[in-house]
């Protein structure tokens, strides 16, 4: 897996009236051992869906807003837009709250941000740089309805003024939310995709000025679950061509195939009015349990880059962290390519590449052309640990299978440091007998792991990257572990799996071991393990 490098006071709006209560600590601060180093987290409070992602071309800064409750570590109203920024998509700096509701029983729900270069909204004059004409489009959720509202910023997205004639769309519904807006060059207008959540509709609207919207069409495909949320629609380039396809994203919760919440996507064409799928396939974005509410950055013309919420609504409110809860995934770059589903079928698939910038390599271990045996594992011997490690390996299945009725596996074990005379581990494995990868995050000493929805063991099928000259399957896997989250990228990102995990107090990832329970069945063609620091 290649690591992509991209070149990349409290002055509130007068409309953000409610006072944010001071955070009350309800338990031990776990920041030292399970706060991720490079995954965006709030300093205190609750975080969920990414909102309003945009790139400021004037300052070369990436902005991420998110659903935020500063008053507690669980979801609850009043709900705000928190705000963080980054110069490299790896290191994040928290800002003041950006948007807030009028009353304590209301919420500024999910939405997006656009740059109104041509001042179609009329909110700006020439004193505001064209690259910083920031307009937020969001769901205003009040007890009896959800409407789509807008607000504008005159200081590059730090503070916002709400439009006096809000709402801009009101369809008299309590389940109408999460607008994602973009400029459609071909028809010279703004496009909004927004969810009629419990009707399983993604509605497509058009506007010339961000204020007056016309309904164009409905998109109604996909795996249903309980409701649709957090849609998106964007052009994604096809690798090794000058072409692209439109991709529709949507999230479902609850009721995803793996339980709880997840993301799906569809590939097709968009003419400015209607999105039409190229095929009838519903594609899954991530095979893990902790990847939801995906959104792409606007106004980044070079690449398609996005973030997701790295949690699951089945257990997000009770994960053992304090004084914050939840993180984002790593930023990922997205392209499309044809990928083998089996030996006879290729389909167009999203390819996901993690973005890591400006990290120090503290320690590393390398191995090449190494045949694993039961008594000869490869293990790091790092004297220190930041809790931030990655591994990149290509391995080949060799020889004849010994027994198709028993496990014949290669495992990547992530061990904690020794603390209180014990260590803890999670593992990723490949079982030759069924040609599947599996993940095990079961840590018996942690009470939270008894939560029935925090699925500890699950698997996914991954087609080989390729076959060698002897017709033996070859697999690639890149993984990055950051205190309490593991992101896996199979076969150069053609499939991913994102999962959180929780070790005992004062334990965090320290060593990585590559092992097998059989002799001579797996050859490490290449292996690189690194300890990193931010």
Swiss-Prot record:
The keyword Signal applies. The gene is INV. GO terms for biological process: inulin catabolic process; raffinose catabolic process; sucrose catabolic process. Its EC number is 3.2.1.26. PANTHER family: EXOINULINASE INUD (AFU_ORTHOLOGUE AFUA_5G00480), INVERTASE 2. It comes from Debaryomyces hansenii (strain ATCC 36239 / CBS 767 / BCRC 21394 / JCM 1990 / NBRC 0083 / IGC 2968). Residues 1-21 form the signal peptide. Belongs to the glycosyl hydrolase 32 family. Pfam families: Glyco_hydro_32C, Glyco_hydro_32N. This is Invertase. Glycans are attached at residues 71, 118-119, 172, 218, 375, 381, 392, 420. Keywords: Glycoprotein, Glycosidase, Hydrolase, Signal. The keyword Glycoprotein applies.
């Amino acid at each position: 897996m290649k690591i992509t490098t991209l070149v990349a006071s409290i002055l509130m709006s007068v409309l953000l009236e409610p006072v944010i209560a001071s955070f009350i600590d309800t338990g031990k601060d776990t920041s030292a051992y399970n706060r991720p180093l490079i995954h965006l987290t709030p300093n205190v409070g609750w975080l969920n869906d990414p909102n309003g992602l945009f790139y400021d071309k004037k300052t070369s800064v990436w902005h991420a807003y998110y659903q935020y409750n500063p008053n507690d570590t669980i979801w609850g109203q009043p709900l705000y837009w928190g705000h963080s920024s980054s110069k490299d998509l790896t290191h994040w700096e928290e800002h003041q709250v950006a948007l807030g509701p009028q009353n304590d029983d209301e919420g500024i729900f999910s939405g997006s941000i656009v740059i109104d270069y041509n001042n179609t909204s009329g909110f700006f004059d020439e004193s505001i740089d064209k690259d910083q004409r920031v307009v937020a489009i969001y769901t205003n959720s009040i007890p009896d309805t959800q409407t789509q509202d807008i607000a504008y910023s005159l200081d590059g997205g730090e503070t916002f003024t709400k439009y006096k004639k809000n709402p801009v769309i009101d369809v008299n519904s309590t389940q109408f939310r999460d607008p994602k807006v973009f400029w459609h060059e071909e028809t010279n207008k703004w496009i909004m995709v927004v969810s009629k959540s419990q009707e399983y509709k993604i509605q497509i609207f058009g506007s010339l000025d961000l204020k007056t919207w016309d309904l164009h069409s409905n998109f109604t495909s996909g795996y249903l679950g309980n409701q649709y949320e957090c849609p998106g629609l964007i052009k994604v380039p096809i690798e090794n061509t000058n072409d692209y396809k439109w991709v529709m994203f949507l999230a479902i919760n609850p009721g995803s195939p793996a339980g709880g919440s997840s993301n799906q996507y569809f590939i097709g064409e968009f003419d400015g009015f209607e999105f039409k799928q190229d095929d009838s396939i519903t594609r899954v974005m991530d095979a893990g349990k902790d990847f939801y509410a995906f959104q792409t950055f606007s106004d980044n013309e070079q690449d398609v880059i996005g973030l997701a919420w790295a949690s699951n609504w089945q257990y997000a409110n009770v994960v053992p962290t304090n004084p914050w809860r939840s993180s984002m995934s790593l930023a990922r770059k997205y392209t499309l390519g044809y990928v083998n589903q089996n030996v006879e079928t290729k389909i167009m698939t999203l390819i996901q590449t993690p973005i890591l910038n400006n990290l120090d390599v503290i320690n590393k271990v390398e191995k090449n052309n190494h045949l694993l045996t039961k008594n000869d594992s490869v293990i790091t011997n790092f004297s220190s640990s930041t809790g931030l490690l990655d591994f990149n390996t290509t391995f080949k299945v060799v020889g004849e299978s010994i027994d198709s009725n028993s496990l014949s596996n290669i495992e990547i074990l992530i061990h904690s440091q020794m603390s209180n005379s014990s260590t803890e581990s999670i593992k990723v494995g490949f079982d030759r007998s069924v040609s599947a990868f599996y993940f095990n995050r079961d840590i018996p000493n942690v009470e939270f792991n008894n939560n029935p929805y925090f699925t500890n063991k699950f698997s996914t099928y991954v087609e080989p990257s390729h076959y060698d000259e002897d017709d033996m399957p070859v697999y690639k896997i890149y993984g990055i572990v950051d205190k309490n989250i593991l992101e896996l990228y199979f076969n150069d990102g053609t499939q991913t799996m994102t999962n959180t995990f929780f070790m005992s107090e004062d334990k965090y990832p320290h060593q990585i071991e590559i092992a097998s329970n059989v002799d001579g069945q797996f050859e490490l063609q290449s292996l690189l393990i690194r300890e990193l620091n931010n």
